[in-house]
Swiss-Prot record:
It comes from Pseudomonas putida (strain W619). The keyword Ribonucleoprotein does not apply. The gene is prfA. One of its GO terms (cellular component) is cytoplasm. PANTHER family: LD18447P. GO terms for molecular function: translation release factor activity, codon specific. Its main location: cytoplasm. SMART domains: PCRF. This is Peptide chain release factor 1. It is found in: Cytoplasm. InterPro entries: PCRF, Pep_chain_release_fac_I, Pep_chain_release_fac_I_sf, Prokaryotic/Mito_RF, RF-1. NCBIfam families: prfA, PRK00591.1.
Length: 360
């Protein structure tokens, strides 16, 4: 193992011992915020230290077996040869595991997200495809045990959505969905197409991590214009008879967020403010760290076809992610919620890039 990695692991070992002592300290235990922070860090470091201890044990076993290679007894030497081979195999696997564990963690990976899907070029067909994408992510959320709630929706005239915004809550939501941001292109024959010609449409997807209270941007109330209006209801006994829907405009940036799904104006306002904070945080982060653009491959733009990150070709049953030249002929499975077929190779490619940088 490289000396630089060993140094990192030794430093982490010292930190682990320090955290163990801190979590047993009465002063820390009485401070819930500090105790939670140290507990979170401890849970992240513990598996790394466990793997490092195993690596050191196998390293000791290897050295012991290598010493036996000089034994006068041929049976002992034969046994030592086998032990050396097994130890070397184990070390390769453990070193690879430790390298992955030492990769820089995205602090947002564990966060909930705001999922924004908007129809781009293609008119009615783009809106219909927005609906298809939303169903795909909804089914994916179900598979992962996540909770998805719609905050705002603007339906298309012939189905689907011109725009739909949802909040997704669960385990490692942003970590899984962060590379879904970008323009998604669809190629298919619309139901209204009598000549059987394939049309191309596009939608944009934005995935914004929901900031927690510690990192949320402080918003000056004077910078906000808050409008209330009557949410569109389905009629009957549940029709919304009060102005519970909220529209908030952030005057300095022109960002507008709306939330109309809750019957309580207070809840809609809280959701809208959280979403606004996420959008402002994303804007600030993108401006400060343009390097993020290279990780996300392509930031969300106008929804124009030229900005595509992924193509869904219905006649061929094909999905192609253009960032990693991945082509899969399992369109139906992916649209049914099997998005991991695309997400996992993307994450693996990103991890490979990180490992290459770690090696440098």
């Amino acid at each position: 193992m490289k000396a630089s990695l060993l140094n990192k692991l030794d430093t982490l070992q010292d930190r682990f011992e320090e955290l163990t002592a801190l979590l047993g300290d009465a002063e820390v235990i009485s401070d819930q915020a500090r105790f939670r922070a140290y507990s979170r860090e401890y849970s992240e470091v513990e598996p790394v230290i466990g793997a490092y201890k195993e690596w050191r044990k196998v390293q000791d076993d290897l050295e012991g077996a290598q010493a036996l290679l000089k034994d006068a007894d041929p049976d002992m030497r034969e046994m030592a040869v086998e032990e050396v081979r097994e130890a070397k195999e184990q070390l390769v696997g453990l070193e690879s595991q430790l390298q992955r564990m030492l990769l820089p963690k995205d602090p947002n990976d564990g966060r909930n997200v705001f999922l924004e899907i908007r129809a781009g070029t293609g008119g009615d067909e783009a809106a219909i495809f927005s609906g298809d994408l939303f169903r795909m992510y909804s089914r994916y959320a179900e598979r992962r045990g996540w909770r998805l709630e719609i905050l705002s929706e603007n339906e298309g005239e012939h189905g689907g959505y011109k725009e739909i915004i949802a909040r997704v809550e669960g385990d490692s939501v942003y970590g899984k969905l962060k590379f879904e941001s970008g323009a998604h292109r669809v190629q298919r024959v619309p139901e209204t197409e009598s000549q059987g010609r394939i049309h191309t449409s596009a939608c944009t997807v934005a995935v914004l991590p929901e900031p927690d209270e510690q990192v949320a941007i402080e918003i000056n109330p004077a910078d906000l214009r808050v409008d209330t209006y009557r949410a569109s209801g389905a009629g009957g006994q549940h029709v919304n008879k009060t102005d519970s829907a909220i529209r908030i405009t952030h005057l300095p940036t022109g960002i507008v967020v709306e939330c109309q799904e809750e019957r309580s104006q207070h809840k809609n306002r809280a959701r809208a403010m959280s979403w606004l904070s996420a959008k402002l945080n994303d804007m600030q982060t993108s401006a400060a760290q343009n390097a993020i653009a290279s990780e996300r491959k392509l930031l969300v733009g106008s929804g124009d076809r030229s900005e595509r990150i992924r193509t869904y070709n219905y006649p061929q049953g094909r999905v192609t992610d253009h960032r990693i030249n991945l082509t899969l002929y399992s369109l139906d499975d992916i649209l049914a919620g099997g998005v991991d077929a695309v997400i996992e190779p993307l994450l693996a490619e990103y991890q490979a890039d990180q490992l290459a940088a770690l090696g440098d």
